[in-house]
Amino acid sequence: MDWSPSTPSEPGCLPAGCQPLGRNRSANVLEQHLRPWRRSDQRWDLLLLLAATRTAEHPGISAAGATPESRRFTALADAELLLEGPDGPRRWPLPPLPAGVSPALLSHVALDCLPLEPHLAVLGLEHPAPFSHLNLEPQDWGPAACLSTGRAMPPERVAWLWRQGLDLGARFQRPVLLTECVPGGTTTAQAVLTALGISVGNLISGSARQPPQELKRMLVEQGLRRASLPPQPSPLAVLAAVGDPFQAVAAGFLVASRQPVLLGGGSQMAAVLALALAALEPRARQDLSRRALLGTTAWLADEQLGPERQPALGWLLDRVGQHFDVPLCGVASGVRFHDSSSQLLRDYERGYVKEGVGAGALLLLAQLQGQPPQALVEACERAVERLPSSP
């Protein structure tokens, strides 16, 4: 894609349309978190973790694929779209969605104008990845069990994945944009946060237009009842009971990292932040809170859940921070599709899809590097037109 030259956004202010999340929104705090991502002379790393959990096989639990069968290859299809673009070679078809288009399309558009080096890791997927990736575990380990069993992963697997995350966190030296593709992952996020003693109530979103909160709550209650965790369980015990492979690697990564980390997503990133904070001493928690920034989409940032009718993600970020006595910071991209020429993109404004594959963080980073929101919208529209069988 041929992008015009851009100038990084001015220090001390957010790019057009961007909004802070939660209470930790003073100008000085925001600038401290955004400064590493404004630099025009900086290269960054993108770490995308693709993972699977049998939790995604419950009908209605996720819209990241319209059927349980299609959700088994969502992560591979989204990764191919991110890397190759809408008209590139593809081994796996994009799964059918109730509405909208894969967020990996938005991620591809933003990635195309950024000096990011992508690294992908595959965890528990049932099919081999047709692209270069990090091998962090044997493929035959397969997906995590449904969290409702209370035995999502063997403790030995959790310990192995945690160590892999520690190794990656220590190995990466440049700022890292960390993101994921895990169908069913918002439900494991809810389970992990609940197991850590954080009251998340109606604060967990999902890919569906109307998140199946009652189904999520039922699965989480079943899993925690069967797990019989002790009071104040360790992060690894929580993961073994109700977690997924992505969370184990990502939390280990955060524990060992010393560089700025931009967390691309919503409640799943809040969960891995909570796991990492639970594993750290108070001083190290403060250090992580100064380096970690959550980046998301405007659609997820604006979503109101539960009777409070308040933006849920900001409340969730605050609640995690309060639990561990650290301030946590988040920013939403300013890209909106109200006036888009594409119905698939306008569906985002109707509450479909919302986020995934780091779309919000990548769009935010593109804006911080000087790309205007309208230019990104138009690039997304052109990308939609290049999709096979695009309406």
Named regions from a protein language model:
Residues 2-179, 183-391:
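N-terminal loops that bind phosphate or other acidic moieties
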